[in-house]
Amino acid sequence: MAKRKGARKKIVKKNIARGVVYINATFNNTVVTVTDEMGNVIAWSSAGSLGFKGSKKSTPFAAQQAVEDAMAKAKEHGIKEVGIKVQGPGSGRDTAVKSVGAIEGIRVLFFKDITPLPHNGCRPPKRRRV
């Protein structure tokens, strides 16, 4: 099947000063999304989209690279201040938060953990025996 040739949508550079960085750290991957204050996505990146495959996606280094990539895209839109919202139990979670704070020209306003916790809802999966 031939690739579709058409006009690609041009990325419009917005001038947004404040944003929110959502870090979703699962056991298998880390997804970083940068939004404006209204929740509209400005930039995103993940360990898998950067070329990490298999078990390498879940490493702290892959999470750090995903954050740096997403923040580089967001800086093109003028982001200077961000809040951080972290979700999930993944191994790349702490490294991702530290690497947001280490980026030059970005000021962190707040940090919040939004991991959903059940009030004794569904039964969890059985323990893994290796």
Curated annotation (Swiss-Prot):
Keywords: Ribonucleoprotein, Ribosomal protein, RNA-binding, rRNA-binding. Pfam families: Ribosomal_S11. One of its GO terms (molecular function) is rRNA binding. One of its GO terms (biological process) is translation. The keyword Manganese does not apply. InterPro entries: Ribosomal_uS11, Ribosomal_uS11_bac-type, Ribosomal_uS11_sf. The keyword Repressor does not apply. GO terms for cellular component: ribonucleoprotein complex; ribosome. Belongs to the universal ribosomal protein uS11 family. Part of the 30S ribosomal subunit. Interacts with proteins S7 and S18. Binds to IF-3. Located on the platform of the 30S subunit, it bridges several disparate RNA helices of the 16S rRNA. Forms part of the Shine-Dalgarno cleft in the 70S ribosome. HAMAP family: Ribosomal_uS11. This is Small ribosomal subunit protein uS11. The gene is rpsK.
